């Protein structure tokens, strides 16, 4: 498709070496991308220049899982988000000033059917907690390649959470709402969705939100009827292919990411 470079086809090939693809892309724009191994999962961590960070402001950790259900293209789930983040990384290294973006491509999200503790991000969040990295804003991007309406996923928080966590989570949700609202002319929605990598962070006491995209008619019908959107029915099948994607979804995702780079939230002790 004209709005995607030819190498996207290479990324969604059934035999693609997705780790090598991501690392080669980032190396090609001048970024190292070491593997962080946690609980047998291989997470990828692009390293941006230190002068693009300022400790006065919150770090914004942006996450997209690169794994996919075996023997499926995974074009929307989640190659679309990964590719948008790779393009974003290229914009970040060329923009002046700070951005405070921490970017991680996670492994093992598709294992979450075995429970949140089996999810790759759970071990990563546990490592964050061990290292004292608990004050980041965490934004998860999942299935961002199809649709015209950005969706903030509704999160059902466990009961009896500390009041400080609930306060921090609500403030993060407010920031997330402003970001997607401004990225699409005020058109956005909030829907109950399957947990993504945000679940692993929440389970470890770190607030995290997740974004996805849906066609407007599917989002509206889901709100009215509770009927599972066609977009979600395509996931984990051969129909999650290049032809299911649309250009506007990538344009909206790009604006969301740029808004995140512009966001400044003062870091409190």
Predicted feature descriptions by range:
Residues 69-182, 190-200:
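Acidic/histidine-rich catalytic neighborhood of metal-dependent amide-processing enzymes
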Residues 192-227:
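Short glycine-rich, acidic/polar surface loops and turns
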Residues 28-36, 177-190:
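Short secondary-structure junctions
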Residues 58-70:
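Glycine/charged-rich beta-loop-alpha catalytic/anionic-binding loops adjacent to active sites
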Residues 60-62, 104, 137-139, 207-211:
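Hydrophobic/aromatic beta-strand patches that form the interior of the parallel beta-sheet core
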Residues 218-269:
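His/Asp/Glu-rich mid-to-C-terminal helical/loop segments that flank catalytic regions of hydrolases
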Residues 6-13, 32, 69-78, 151-153, ...:
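Second-shell loop/turn segments in exported
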Residues 2-53:
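A non-catalytic alpha/beta surface segment that caps or lines the substrate-entry region
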């Amino acid at each position: 498709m004209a709005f995607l470079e030819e190498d996207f086809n290479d990324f969604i090939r059934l035999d693609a070496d997705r780790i090598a693809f991501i690392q080669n892309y980032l190396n090609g724009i001048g970024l190292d991308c070491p593997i962080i191994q946690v609980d047998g999962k291989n997470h990828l961590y692009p390293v941006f220049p230190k002068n693009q960070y300022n400790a006065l402001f919150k770090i914004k950790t942006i996450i997209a899982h690169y794994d996919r259900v075996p023997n499926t293209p995974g074009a929307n789930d989640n190659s679309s988000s990964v590719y948008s983040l790779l393009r974003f990384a290229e914009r970040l290294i060329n923009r002046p000033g700070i951005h405070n973006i921490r970017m991680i491509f996670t492994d093992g999200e598709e294992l979450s059917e075995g429970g949140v503790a089996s999810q790759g991000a759970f071990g990563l969040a546990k490592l964050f907690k061990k290292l004292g990295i608990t004050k980041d804003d965490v934004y998860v991007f999942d299935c961002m390649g199809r649709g015209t309406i950005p969706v903030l996923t509704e999160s059902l928080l466990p009961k009896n959470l500390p009041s400080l966590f609930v306060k921090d989570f609500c403030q993060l949700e407010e920031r997330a709402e402003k970001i997607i609202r401004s990225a699409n002319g005020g058109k956005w929605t909030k829907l109950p969705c399957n947990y993504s990598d945000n679940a692993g962070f929440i389970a470890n006491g770190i607030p995290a939100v997740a974004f996805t995209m849906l066609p407007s008619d599917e989002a509206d019908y889901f709100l009215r009827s509770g009927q599972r959107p066609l977009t979600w029915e395509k996931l984990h099948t051969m129909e999650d292919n290049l032809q299911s994607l649309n250009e506007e979804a990538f344009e909206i995702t790009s604006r969301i990411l740029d808004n995140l780079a512009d966001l400044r939230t003062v870091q409190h002790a």
